[in-house]
């Protein structure tokens, strides 16, 4: 139904290029909201199917992050944000899910950054685990919200989320992916000069069943 709605809206707009500005604005809003609902539905389906994903692939993180940077460069360039990578590591897990986890963290750091800021992904490999730090130069997250940001549909700044089309599911999915791999994610530090999110993951593929996210 959502795909049909999107197609019908696009067709109507294409067939009526001379519609009044008020109508065009209204239809544009409808398209934005339909797309947002479609993305929300897709993410919820992904979250419900996480347990079925195989997690036995060997993953080298630095090349993966470089690919993520390539995908997100157009978004970063809009605000003059530089993307930086430090370190590398190898782990066993789901390549697709780890990609999505780091992508979501990096995308979030870009969206809520300051103009001409920077985002750094730092990977540290230890004998038994990996530490992935994603740091930005944004305005920071108030301390009272630092536990809540991993809850589904939670948004610190609703006006900026509307601007970027966020539904408040990106970090909830990050939490679920980390937990599914036997790891964790948290706000390592945050101030008015920026935020660092830390994801800690075991390097081995012996993942236990993911603990339930009590915020869900």
Question: Model-derived features: where do they sit?
Answer:
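Short helix-loop "hinge" at the ATP-lid/N-box region of the Bergerat-fold HATPase_c
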Residues: 109-110
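Acidic ATP/Mg2+-coordinating residue in the GHKL
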Residues: 136
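Short conserved segments within the C-terminal catalytic ATPase subdomain
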Residues: 75-85
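Conserved micro-motifs of the catalytic ATP-binding
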Residues: 46, 50-57, 90-96
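Short conserved segment of the HATPase_c
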Residues: 141-155
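Short alpha-helical segment of the dimerization/phosphotransfer core of two-component systems
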Residues: 29-37
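Conserved glycine-rich
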Residues: 182-183
